[in-house]
Regions:
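Outer-membrane beta-barrel proteins
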Residues: 2-7, 11, 15-205
């Protein structure tokens, strides 16, 4: 999914807007999602609408063998210093890259910490439908962040990510170091990757 707005980040940004249409474009040196390599390089783009905590949007990325096309909607808000959100995300693919994933997204944040949980189902073309739970703990301060995340139920694997993001000349840039275990690797070995991302968001009046 999105390089900048993922999970709770998208939900919480929705909670701060009144009414806003926006478009975004981006590029990643390696497109990883939840510790799993999707494409060795990937351009992307999306559209979002946010209003009084509610959000809806779509996002697409090149995944080498076709396109990943995501759709999502939900609601986020704040109570004092605590942020919360609930939403739905569907991941759809052209070509033969993968099958459909659909999930409910839950999130909560306080201070520098956020917790994300996704409860989903995978339409496995090669076998029975699979259920999964994704969980993540992220600590972020002044653009620097660390994340520990993994899967349970029919999926398995864990990863750790360290990174930094900033806005430079009106561009959102990021650098991340990813450590993923062998369960998330297509080669069956543990994986370490340095990932560079760049993107820009445009307000649509």
């Amino acid at each position: 999914m999105k390089f900048v707005k993922t999970g709770l980040a998208l939900i919480l940004l929705a909670g701060t807007a009144q009414a806003d249409f926006s478009a975004n474009v981006g590029w990643a040196s390696d497109y990883y999602f939840r510790g799993i390599l999707q494409s060795p390089t990937s351009p992307s783009g999306g559209l979002d609408y946010e209003s009084n905590g509610f959000y809806v949007g779509t996002w697409a990325a090149d995944v080498y063998d076709g396109l990943e096309i995501d759709g999502y909607f939900g609601y986020g808000g704040e109570v004092g210093d605590f942020s919360y959100g609930i939403g739905y995300t569907g991941y759809f693919y052209t070509g033969d890259f993968d099958d459909t994933y659909q999930e409910i997204n839950l999130g909560g944040g306080y201070g520098i910490a956020t917790v994300d949980v996704a409860i989903g189902q995978y339409d496995n073309r090669d076998g029975p439908t699979l259920d999964y739970t994704y969980y993540a703990l992220t600590l972020e301060k002044n653009g620097f962040y660390g994340k520990y995340a993994g899967f349970s139920q029919d999926f398995s694997g864990e990863y750790f990510e360290l990174g930094y993001g900033a806005t430079v000349a009106e561009l959102d840039v990021g650098l991340a170091l990813l450590f993923a275990d062998k369960d998330l690797s297509i080669t069956g070995d543990s994986n370490e990757s340095l990932i560079f991302t760049i993107g820009k968001t445009f307000d649509i009046q």
